[in-house]
């Protein structure tokens, strides 16, 4: 899904994936299970980091996967 919330300008080719946090890891990392079943390691980015949003297991989030490593990504927003 391409930038569903229009929070920040989408980078061409950037694909937002829906997922749910399954674990909070050390050093500000999170394990997220995407809706297609994949597990990725992510970190908070952008507005989520600046707002100090509390992210706990089972929180629904939007994730952008890294281009070079599809097993890593960044959390760009919380889902409603």
Segments predicted by a language model, with ranges:
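Short boundary/loop segments of OB/S1/cold-shock single-stranded nucleic-acid-binding domains
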Residues: 1-17, 78
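Conserved hydrophobic positions within beta-strands
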Residues: 19-21, 75
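Short, conserved secondary-structure segments in the cores of folded domains
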Residues: 20, 30, 51-52
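A short macromolecule-binding patch
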Residues: 38-46
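Short nucleic-acid-contacting surface segments enriched for D/E, G, S/T with interspersed K/R
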Residues: 48-62
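OB-fold/S1-family single-stranded nucleic acid-binding modules
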Residues: 67-80
